[in-house]
Amino acid sequence: MNIAEFHQNIDQIWDSIEEQLENQDIDADCERQGAVFTITFENRTQIVINKQEPLLELWLASKLGGFHFSYKNGDWLNYEGKRFWDCLAQACAAHGEEVSFA
């Protein structure tokens, strides 16, 4: 994956997150600032997702800790092989919102 493909892929992920939260009537605000995407829930807790361009990684930080994901075999996986979408759903649950990401 080159740099342009990396940014395009992450932008699609961020669009998908916003769309899925909205479609499931989740009370959360999404904000993009450069390489950082922040989800702020009604209880004012946050999940922060950011691009790490030099490493071509996607990072997720929440109450559950920090996770780093690399693009492998068509999916974003952490070093344990856990999918980004599954970790994001778990993070949302830890912040008080049950979300199903497809």
Curated annotation (Swiss-Prot):
Domain of life (superkingdom): Bacteria
Keywords, ordered alphabetically: Iron, Metal-binding
Single GO biological process annotation from the record:
iron-sulfur cluster assembly
GO MF, one term, reads: ferric iron binding
Xref: InterPro entries: CyaY, Frataxin/CyaY, Frataxin/CyaY_sf, Frataxin_CS
Q: Which GO terms describe its cellular component?
A: cytosol
According to its UniProt entry, what is the function of this protein? Involved in iron-sulfur (Fe-S) cluster assembly. May act as a regulator of Fe-S biogenesis.
Give the UniProt family note: Belongs to the frataxin family.
PANTHER family referenced in this protein's UniProt entry, alphabetically:
FRATAXIN, FRATAXIN, MITOCHONDRIAL
Protein name per UniProt? Iron-sulfur cluster assembly protein CyaY
Organism, by scientific name, is Mannheimia succiniciproducens (strain KCTC 0769BP / MBEL55E)
